[in-house]
Protein backbone atom coordinates (compact mmCIF):
# COMPACT_ATOMS: atom_id res chain seq x y z
CA UNK A 1 0.00 0.00 0.00
CA UNK A 2 2.83 2.40 0.94
CA UNK A 3 4.55 1.54 -2.33
CA UNK A 4 1.35 2.42 -4.24
CA UNK A 5 1.08 5.77 -2.41
CA UNK A 6 4.69 6.60 -3.22
CA UNK A 7 4.06 5.78 -6.88
CA UNK A 8 1.02 8.09 -6.98
CA UNK A 9 2.98 10.81 -5.16
CA UNK A 10 5.85 10.58 -7.63
CA UNK A 11 3.41 10.79 -10.54
CA UNK A 12 1.82 13.90 -9.02
CA UNK A 13 5.24 15.54 -8.63
CA UNK A 14 6.04 14.78 -12.29
CA UNK A 15 2.71 16.25 -13.41
CA UNK A 16 3.30 19.43 -11.35
CA UNK A 17 6.81 19.77 -12.76
CA UNK A 18 5.47 19.30 -16.28
CA UNK A 19 2.87 22.03 -15.71
CA UNK A 20 5.58 24.40 -14.43
CA UNK A 21 7.71 23.73 -17.51
CA UNK A 22 4.77 24.34 -19.83
CA UNK A 23 4.08 27.71 -18.23
CA UNK A 24 7.47 29.16 -19.20
CA UNK A 25 6.74 29.57 -22.93
CA UNK A 26 3.63 31.57 -22.02
CA UNK A 27 5.78 34.17 -20.25
CA UNK A 28 8.06 34.31 -23.27
CA UNK A 29 5.08 34.73 -25.60
CA UNK A 30 3.82 37.53 -23.37
CA UNK A 31 7.16 39.32 -23.80
CA UNK A 32 7.03 38.84 -27.57
CA UNK A 33 3.49 40.19 -27.64
CA UNK A 34 4.57 43.30 -25.73
CA UNK A 35 7.35 44.05 -28.22
CA UNK A 36 4.91 43.52 -31.09
CA UNK A 37 2.56 45.97 -29.41
CA UNK A 38 5.35 48.56 -29.26
CA UNK A 39 6.11 48.30 -32.98
CA UNK A 40 2.44 48.35 -33.98
CA UNK A 41 1.75 51.29 -31.67
CA UNK A 42 4.54 53.34 -33.27
CA UNK A 43 3.31 52.46 -36.76
CA UNK A 44 -0.31 53.31 -35.98
CA UNK A 45 0.73 56.64 -34.47
CA UNK A 46 2.98 57.48 -37.44
CA UNK A 47 0.07 56.96 -39.83
CA UNK A 48 -1.29 60.21 -38.38
CA UNK A 49 -3.39 58.93 -35.50
CA UNK A 50 -3.48 60.79 -32.18
CA UNK A 51 -2.12 59.43 -28.91
CA UNK A 52 -5.68 58.94 -27.68
CA UNK A 53 -6.81 57.05 -30.80
CA UNK A 54 -3.63 54.96 -30.83
CA UNK A 55 -4.23 53.87 -27.24
CA UNK A 56 -7.85 53.04 -28.03
CA UNK A 57 -6.89 51.04 -31.12
CA UNK A 58 -4.03 49.10 -29.51
CA UNK A 59 -5.87 48.34 -26.26
CA UNK A 60 -8.87 47.11 -28.21
CA UNK A 61 -6.82 45.02 -30.62
CA UNK A 62 -4.64 43.34 -28.00
CA UNK A 63 -6.98 43.50 -24.99
CA UNK A 64 -4.35 45.47 -23.07
CA UNK A 65 -4.27 48.51 -20.80
CA UNK A 66 -1.41 50.43 -22.39
CA UNK A 67 -0.78 53.70 -20.56
CA UNK A 68 -0.23 57.04 -22.26
CA UNK A 69 3.17 57.58 -20.62
CA UNK A 70 4.39 54.21 -21.91
CA UNK A 71 3.27 54.97 -25.46
CA UNK A 72 4.83 58.43 -25.30
CA UNK A 73 8.15 56.94 -24.16
CA UNK A 74 8.13 54.46 -27.05
CA UNK A 75 7.50 57.27 -29.53
CA UNK A 76 10.21 59.52 -28.05
CA UNK A 77 12.76 56.70 -28.03
CA UNK A 78 12.02 55.88 -31.67
CA UNK A 79 12.33 59.53 -32.76
CA UNK A 80 15.85 59.64 -31.28
CA UNK A 81 17.20 57.45 -34.08
CA UNK A 82 14.60 58.09 -36.80
CA UNK A 83 13.18 61.59 -36.56
CA UNK A 84 10.04 61.59 -38.70
CA UNK A 85 8.19 64.37 -36.85
CA UNK A 86 7.99 66.61 -39.93
CA UNK A 87 6.45 63.86 -42.04
CA UNK A 88 3.89 62.95 -39.39
CA UNK A 89 2.94 66.61 -38.92
CA UNK A 90 2.30 66.91 -42.67
CA UNK A 91 0.20 63.73 -42.61
CA UNK A 92 -1.98 65.11 -39.81
CA UNK A 93 -2.40 68.53 -41.44
CA UNK A 94 -3.03 67.55 -45.07
CA UNK A 95 -3.87 63.90 -45.70
CA UNK A 96 -6.79 62.94 -43.46
CA UNK A 97 -5.91 59.25 -43.30
CA UNK A 98 -5.03 58.85 -47.00
CA UNK A 99 -1.46 57.72 -46.38
CA UNK A 100 -0.75 54.29 -47.90
CA UNK A 101 -1.98 53.36 -51.37
CA UNK A 102 -1.71 49.69 -52.28
CA UNK A 103 -2.39 47.22 -55.06
CA UNK A 104 -1.66 43.49 -55.30
CA UNK A 105 -0.06 42.01 -58.42
CA UNK A 106 -0.10 38.29 -59.12
CA UNK A 107 3.01 37.53 -61.13
CA UNK A 108 3.94 33.94 -61.97
CA UNK A 109 1.57 32.68 -59.29
CA UNK A 110 3.06 34.85 -56.52
CA UNK A 111 1.22 37.76 -54.87
CA UNK A 112 3.22 40.99 -54.56
CA UNK A 113 1.73 43.75 -52.40
CA UNK A 114 2.85 46.96 -54.04
CA UNK A 115 2.43 50.00 -51.77
CA UNK A 116 3.44 53.64 -51.82
CA UNK A 117 3.39 56.30 -49.10
CA UNK A 118 1.59 59.26 -50.67
CA UNK A 119 2.68 62.00 -48.21
CA UNK A 120 6.36 61.05 -48.39
CA UNK A 121 6.17 60.70 -52.15
CA UNK A 122 4.68 64.20 -52.42
CA UNK A 123 7.27 65.65 -50.03
CA UNK A 124 10.41 63.98 -51.37
CA UNK A 125 9.86 63.62 -55.13
CA UNK A 126 9.83 67.24 -56.32
CA UNK A 127 12.87 66.50 -58.50
CA UNK A 128 11.47 63.19 -59.74
CA UNK A 129 7.98 63.86 -61.16
CA UNK A 130 8.29 61.02 -63.67
CA UNK A 131 8.88 58.58 -60.81
CA UNK A 132 5.67 59.78 -59.16
CA UNK A 133 3.79 59.22 -62.41
CA UNK A 134 5.30 55.76 -62.77
CA UNK A 135 4.20 54.69 -59.28
CA UNK A 136 0.71 56.14 -59.53
CA UNK A 137 0.04 54.52 -62.91
CA UNK A 138 1.44 51.06 -62.18
CA UNK A 139 -1.99 49.63 -61.43
CA UNK A 140 -3.18 50.17 -65.00
CA UNK A 141 0.09 50.18 -66.94
CA UNK A 142 2.07 47.25 -65.52
CA UNK A 143 2.05 44.56 -68.27
CA UNK A 144 0.91 41.26 -66.79
CA UNK A 145 2.31 39.21 -69.68
CA UNK A 146 5.85 40.51 -69.12
CA UNK A 147 5.90 38.86 -65.69
CA UNK A 148 4.34 35.53 -66.67
CA UNK A 149 7.67 34.10 -67.76
CA UNK A 150 10.95 34.31 -65.86
CA UNK A 151 12.09 37.67 -67.15
CA UNK A 152 15.49 37.61 -65.48
CA UNK A 153 18.39 35.78 -67.04
CA UNK A 154 19.76 33.75 -64.12
CA UNK A 155 23.04 33.14 -65.98
CA UNK A 156 23.82 36.84 -66.25
CA UNK A 157 26.55 37.88 -63.82
CA UNK A 158 28.20 41.30 -63.86
CA UNK A 159 31.42 42.31 -62.13
CA UNK A 160 30.10 45.16 -59.98
CA UNK A 161 32.12 47.01 -57.35
CA UNK A 162 30.25 47.11 -54.05
CA UNK A 163 31.05 49.09 -50.90
CA UNK A 164 30.30 47.56 -47.49
CA UNK A 165 29.10 49.90 -44.75
CA UNK A 166 28.79 49.39 -41.00
CA UNK A 167 25.93 47.82 -39.09
CA UNK A 168 24.85 51.21 -37.76
CA UNK A 169 23.35 52.21 -41.08
CA UNK A 170 19.76 53.35 -40.47
CA UNK A 171 18.35 50.68 -42.78
CA UNK A 172 20.03 48.00 -40.64
CA UNK A 173 18.72 49.58 -37.44
CA UNK A 174 15.16 49.73 -38.75
CA UNK A 175 15.34 46.12 -39.95
CA UNK A 176 16.68 45.06 -36.56
CA UNK A 177 13.95 46.99 -34.74
CA UNK A 178 11.14 45.53 -36.84
CA UNK A 179 12.48 41.95 -36.81
CA UNK A 180 12.48 41.88 -33.01
CA UNK A 181 8.74 42.33 -33.02
CA UNK A 182 7.54 39.45 -35.17
CA UNK A 183 6.17 36.05 -34.27
CA UNK A 184 6.79 32.67 -35.88
CA UNK A 185 3.83 33.08 -38.24
CA UNK A 186 4.94 36.41 -39.72
CA UNK A 187 6.93 36.86 -42.92
CA UNK A 188 10.03 38.80 -41.90
CA UNK A 189 10.46 40.18 -45.39
CA UNK A 190 7.04 41.84 -45.48
CA UNK A 191 7.35 43.00 -41.85
CA UNK A 192 10.55 44.93 -42.62
CA UNK A 193 9.02 46.44 -45.77
CA UNK A 194 5.83 47.55 -44.04
CA UNK A 195 7.62 48.97 -41.01
CA UNK A 196 10.09 50.97 -43.10
CA UNK A 197 7.38 52.25 -45.44
CA UNK A 198 5.38 53.64 -42.51
CA UNK A 199 8.13 54.80 -40.17
CA UNK A 200 11.30 55.51 -42.13
CA UNK A 201 11.87 59.09 -43.31
CA UNK A 202 12.97 58.23 -46.86
CA UNK A 203 11.13 55.04 -47.94
CA UNK A 204 8.35 55.91 -50.39
CA UNK A 205 7.31 52.51 -51.82
CA UNK A 206 7.76 48.74 -51.55
CA UNK A 207 7.41 45.75 -53.91
CA UNK A 208 7.66 48.05 -56.94
CA UNK A 209 7.31 46.22 -60.28
CA UNK A 210 9.90 47.01 -62.93
CA UNK A 211 10.36 45.64 -66.44
CA UNK A 212 12.22 46.43 -69.64
CA UNK A 213 13.98 44.85 -72.59
CA UNK A 214 17.75 45.21 -72.58
CA UNK A 215 18.28 45.59 -76.31
CA UNK A 216 22.07 45.30 -76.15
CA UNK A 217 21.85 41.97 -74.33
CA UNK A 218 18.62 40.88 -76.02
CA UNK A 219 17.31 39.98 -72.56
CA UNK A 220 13.97 40.76 -70.91
CA UNK A 221 14.14 41.92 -67.30
CA UNK A 222 11.24 41.90 -64.85
CA UNK A 223 10.97 41.84 -61.08
CA UNK A 224 9.99 43.72 -57.93
CA UNK A 225 12.05 46.23 -55.97
CA UNK A 226 11.75 45.58 -52.23
CA UNK A 227 12.10 49.19 -51.10
CA UNK A 228 12.32 52.49 -52.94
CA UNK A 229 13.84 55.50 -51.16
CA UNK A 230 14.59 59.14 -51.89
CA UNK A 231 17.61 60.53 -50.06
CA UNK A 232 20.63 62.70 -50.76
CA UNK A 233 19.09 63.73 -54.06
CA UNK A 234 19.07 60.17 -55.39
CA UNK A 235 16.66 57.28 -55.91
CA UNK A 236 17.70 54.26 -53.83
CA UNK A 237 16.75 50.68 -54.68
CA UNK A 238 17.03 48.51 -51.57
CA UNK A 239 16.78 44.73 -51.35
CA UNK A 240 16.25 43.19 -47.91
CA UNK A 241 18.20 39.93 -47.57
CA UNK A 242 17.81 38.08 -44.22
CA UNK A 243 21.45 36.93 -44.41
CA UNK A 244 23.01 39.63 -46.57
CA UNK A 245 26.63 38.70 -45.87
CA UNK A 246 26.19 35.19 -47.29
CA UNK A 247 24.52 36.32 -50.51
CA UNK A 248 26.36 35.91 -53.79
CA UNK A 249 27.45 39.50 -54.39
CA UNK A 250 27.55 39.24 -58.15
CA UNK A 251 24.07 37.74 -58.34
CA UNK A 252 22.42 40.33 -56.08
CA UNK A 253 24.34 43.28 -57.54
CA UNK A 254 23.52 42.18 -61.11
CA UNK A 255 19.82 42.01 -60.30
CA UNK A 256 19.83 45.45 -58.67
CA UNK A 257 21.83 46.94 -61.54
CA UNK A 258 19.28 45.66 -64.05
CA UNK A 259 16.36 46.90 -61.93
CA UNK A 260 17.96 50.34 -61.71
CA UNK A 261 18.53 50.32 -65.47
CA UNK A 262 14.89 49.37 -66.01
CA UNK A 263 13.54 52.05 -63.68
CA UNK A 264 15.86 54.61 -65.29
CA UNK A 265 14.49 53.63 -68.70
CA UNK A 266 10.86 53.79 -67.55
CA UNK A 267 11.14 57.13 -65.74
CA UNK A 268 13.79 58.82 -67.92
CA UNK A 269 15.75 59.58 -64.74
CA UNK A 270 19.52 59.38 -65.45
CA UNK A 271 21.21 56.26 -64.10
CA UNK A 272 23.64 58.56 -62.26
CA UNK A 273 20.74 59.51 -59.98
CA UNK A 274 20.28 55.92 -58.77
CA UNK A 275 21.92 53.97 -55.98
CA UNK A 276 21.54 50.25 -55.29
CA UNK A 277 21.90 48.42 -51.98
CA UNK A 278 21.03 45.24 -50.11
CA UNK A 279 21.02 44.82 -46.35
CA UNK A 280 19.95 42.96 -43.22
CA UNK A 281 20.12 43.80 -39.51
CA UNK A 282 23.93 43.82 -39.47
CA UNK A 283 25.24 44.55 -42.95
CA UNK A 284 24.66 47.07 -45.72
CA UNK A 285 26.16 46.90 -49.23
CA UNK A 286 25.84 49.75 -51.73
CA UNK A 287 26.98 50.71 -55.22
CA UNK A 288 26.44 53.37 -57.86
CA UNK A 289 25.11 51.66 -61.02
CA UNK A 290 26.40 54.46 -63.22
CA UNK A 291 30.01 53.95 -62.13
CA UNK A 292 30.37 50.37 -63.30
CA UNK A 293 32.71 49.10 -66.02
CA UNK A 294 32.21 45.54 -67.18
CA UNK A 295 31.94 43.22 -70.14
CA UNK A 296 29.67 40.22 -70.35
CA UNK A 297 28.99 37.56 -72.96
CA UNK A 298 25.43 36.35 -73.32
CA UNK A 299 23.69 34.57 -76.17
CA UNK A 300 27.01 34.64 -78.09
CA UNK A 301 27.11 38.44 -77.89
CA UNK A 302 29.81 40.39 -76.09
CA UNK A 303 28.45 43.46 -74.35
CA UNK A 304 30.80 46.18 -73.10
CA UNK A 305 29.89 48.91 -70.67
CA UNK A 306 32.61 51.51 -70.12
CA UNK A 307 32.51 54.99 -68.68
Give the residues covered by each predicted segment.
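Major-groove recognition helix of helix-turn-helix-like DNA-binding domains
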Residues: 1, 64-83
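Short Lys/Arg-enriched helix C-cap and helix-to-coil transition segments
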Residues: 4-5, 79-99
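Short, Lys/Arg-enriched anionic-surface-contact patches
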Residues: 16-37
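Short, amphipathic alpha-helical "recognition" segments used to contact nucleic acids or chromatin
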Residues: 32-49
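Short, charged amphipathic recognition helices of the HTH superfamily
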Residues: 46-60
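An acidic, glycine-rich, mixed-charge low-complexity segment common to nucleic-acid enzymes
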Residues: 91-152
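Catalytic cores of nuclease domains that cleave nucleic-acid phosphodiester backbones
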Residues: 156-236
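Nucleic-acid nuclease catalytic cores
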Residues: 223, 230-295
